[in-house]
Amino acid sequence: MKQHLIVEVFRSSKHDGMYLYVEKSKGLKEIPEELMTRFGKGISAMTMLLTNESKLARATPENVTKGIREKGFYLQLPPAKDEYLLDLYKTPTEAVY
């Protein structure tokens, strides 16, 4: 079964890599206030026709469609930071010889 949905993708003004997918016709009107407080001002990143064949960077079209149909939105969180990479930028606290 083919499903088509016109979605608007907003990026967060507070968190890099956080995106909110919503149905274009509804926009951000029905997003819970608590989520919008944490998300910040939604900055429109793109509008797209979402189908089961769509290619998305860090989500599947099925999950995005399901989230929008059930909750009115799909929240894509930033990727987890690799702890090893974070350690490269820490100031050493003990001498290593």
Swiss-Prot record:
Pfam families: YcgL. Residues 5-89 form the YcgL domain. It comes from the Bacteria. Disulfide bonds: none annotated. InterPro entries: YcgL-like_sf (IPR038068), YcgL_dom (IPR027354). This is YcgL domain-containing protein Mmwyl1_2530. It comes from Marinomonas sp. (strain MWYL1).
